[in-house]
């Protein structure tokens, strides 16, 4: 897909990719040993003058949890299972990263891809997420590939129109269907939550009959803490 086609979704006035730019612009920002070692560091990607800078910088994470039957007391925690794929700050860097990513249909079940603003980790406990929530839509697998691409491009292009309120988007590959989620900062801001929901429905062209579920991170954290307390007493 060309950058011009991407502009249809998020209104960037970007010319066709020129020779010498594009994928090469993201080579130093994809998943590599430096990213693995410095995953907690807020490293701002360098944007050369000829590239088209995004409003925000982003990082992409991958995680995969084992099936329930394989879970044990020694299973790696969620935070440790997150693997940094790369960081992007321009249109060219994004396409350089995206063209090397596995498509949803190629990912095994229980895999997740997380595209978040740089500095925000895809965890409930992150300070930017702890008071927020997410909208979740369930899709047939045949719909997921296009919907995930549209969702990423809409986030990069500020099509949700809520500015810093938006934290990230998540693809969750499951056995029978897939889930897409949009995370935002403030669950108590009902107006902001409604704007995110309405934008999600518009971006994915979801009919009114398709349900979108809301989950507040605080509720999930409290439930998780209760479960941990019960396990500690058992």
Residue positions per predicted region:
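ADP-ribose/nucleotidyl-moiety interaction motifs
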Residues: 2-234
């Amino acid at each position: 897909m060309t950058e011009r086609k991407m502009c249809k979704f998020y209104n960037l006035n970007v010319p066709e990719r020129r020779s010498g730019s594009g994928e090469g612009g993201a080579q130093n920002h994809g998943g590599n040993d430096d990213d693995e070692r410095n995953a907690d560091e807020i490293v701002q990607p360098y944007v050369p003058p000829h590239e088209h800078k995004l409003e925000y910088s982003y990082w992409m994470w991958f995680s995969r949890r084992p099936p329930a039957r394989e879970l044990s007391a020694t299973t790696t925690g969620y935070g440790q299972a997150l693997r940094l794929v790369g960081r992007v700050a321009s249109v060219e860097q994004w396409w350089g990263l995206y063209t090397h990513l596995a498509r949803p249909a190629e990912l095994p079940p229980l895999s997740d891809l997380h595209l978040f603003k740089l500095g925000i980790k895809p965890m409930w406990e992150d300070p930017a997420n702890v008071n927020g929530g997410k909208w979740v839509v369930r899709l047939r697998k045949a719909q997921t590939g296009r919907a995930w691409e549209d969702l990423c491009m809409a986030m990069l292009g500020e099509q949700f129109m809520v500015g810093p309120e938006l934290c990230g988007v998540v693809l969750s590959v499951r056995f029978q269907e897939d889930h897409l989620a949009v995370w935002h900062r403030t669950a108590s801001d009902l107006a902001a939550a409604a704007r995110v929901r309405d934008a999600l429905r518009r971006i994915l062209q979801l009919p009114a009959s398709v349900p979108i579920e809301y989950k507040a991170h605080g509720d999930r954290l409290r439930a998780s803490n209760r479960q941990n307390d019960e396990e500690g007493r058992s």
